[in-house]
Amino acid sequence: MSLSRRQFIQASGIALCAGAVPLKASAAGQQQPLPVPPLLESRRGQPLFMTVQRAHWSFTPGTRASVWGINGRYLGPTIRVWKGDDVKLIYSNRLTENVSMTVAGLQVPGPLMGGPARMMSPNADWAPVLPIRQNAATLWYHANTPNRTAQQVYNGLAGMWLVEDEVSKSLPIPNHYGVDDFPVIIQDKRLDNFGTPEYNEPGSGGFVGDTLLVNGVQSPYVEVSRGWVRLRLLNASNSRRYQLQMNDGRPLHVISGDQGFLPAPVSVKQLSLAPGERREILVDMSNGDEVSITCGEAASIVDRIRGFFEPSSILVSTLVLTLRPTGLLPLVTDSLPMRLLPTEIMAGSPIRSRDISLGDDPGINGQLWDVNRIDVTAQQGTWERWTVRADEPQAFHIEGVMFQIRNVNGAMPFPEDRGWKDTVWVDGQVELLVYFGQPSWAHFPFYFNSQTLEMADRGSIGQLLVNPVP
């Protein structure tokens, strides 16, 4: 439906004379404390219980919406595990439809990744034991149910997963969860006038909403001590990419990507965050000034009025998070570390090259996902060169592997993209150097897929078999 001149004039009169604004626009102007998901840590001999169930959540002050979540909460607890642990998870499905779950970025064999072969019917459980052998990184877990991933993630089946190791423990960076080390889960939604999320699958492409949410609320703030603050950023949106920056122009110090620390911090004025991508940043709050992270220009009054009549993809507010320093500056403060890893990240020699094509229509290399077809067969312990092309800009993810970006449209990747990754934004062509460190099997393959969740549900998924080392 298009907005006619008559409707615009009528709505303008209503809005200006009566002060009427949509609930989401009103809520965007009210800052709320940042909700910090509870921390669930692995302990030897004790399983981690993850119950997938209905929940209630307040996306806007004074409202309460029926949603999905983990352990009775919209989004789930933050899981923290340690390298060397063998972590037993017990997933329980208390919904009325099938669900499968995965931990994106986890380096484990195919049978432990989730997917169609690990589908949980209503009232069923799945209890994998996950060997944690990878380096410190910020990962995320989410639903990956065939043909239902977009809806289920949108409903709330997602959360952050942290891997720690001796390096992350010893570095002079913030590590007190919920004090100076915060999860920041960014999503966009469309809320009705009662604060309830609306989801209508688009006819093409992926869903984009007009309401920015961080950890489930609009326009949050958090009080922090003066000094360094660590933010673990996750884009859990269905398809929207964000360009993050500080409102006062100070730099974002990037210390980590999808699969762990960069060799050294990288200071940037603007930072891209694609769907499914994770980054860690440090923010210097020692000067005592309040600062906000934003992601572009917010909707104008015309756009907001238009939102009365038709769905909008323009964000009402682009405020991600406000940091409010409190207290005095400590007598001793750590400086930004010069190095995060003792050596540079090295790459091996690829044994073969592949072309991966993501089109405007669903499918990869012209084929829709088929659970009975293996699309790529590789060998554990080897490297390959993948050239990924996309007609429509979108994020691309590979399960069970790590890769390095070698070039983007023929140019070197940005410094913040030169670490180990598993998700990349493709706008044109990117060349990846992929390392296959984990095995998979025909009945338990890895996925490689469009991270536009609706495109994946429509068939933009391939299946990867990695033959184990003999």
From Swiss-Prot:
Protein name per Swiss-Prot or TrEMBL: Cell division protein FtsP
GO CC entries: cell division site; outer membrane-bounded periplasmic space
Known role: Cell division protein that is required for growth during stress conditions. May be involved in protecting or stabilizing the divisomal assembly under conditions of stress.
Any matching Pfam family: Cu-oxidase_3
Keywords (A to Z) from UniProt: Cell cycle, Cell division, Periplasm, Signal
Post-translational modification: Exported by the Tat system. The position of the signal peptide cleavage has been experimentally proven. Can also be exported by the Sec system.
Sequence similarity: Belongs to the FtsP family.
Additional detail: Is used as a model substrate in studies of the twin-arginine translocation (Tat) protein transport system.
Biological process, per Gene Ontology: cell division; FtsZ-dependent cytokinesis; response to ionizing radiation; response to oxidative stress; response to stress
Database matches in InterPro entries: Cu-oxidase-like_N, Cu-oxidase_C, Cu-oxidase_fam, Cupredoxin, FtsP, TAT_signal, TAT_signal_bac_arc
Principal localisation: periplasm
Record carries keyword Ligase: no
Record carries keyword Cell cycle: yes
Residue ranges constituting the Plastocyanin-like domain according to the UniProt record: 68-164
Disruption phenotype: Cells lacking this gene are sensitive to oxidative stress and DNA damage at high temperature. They also exhibit filamentation.
Localization of this protein: Periplasm
Range of residues in the leader sequence: 1-27
GO molecular function term, any single one: copper ion binding
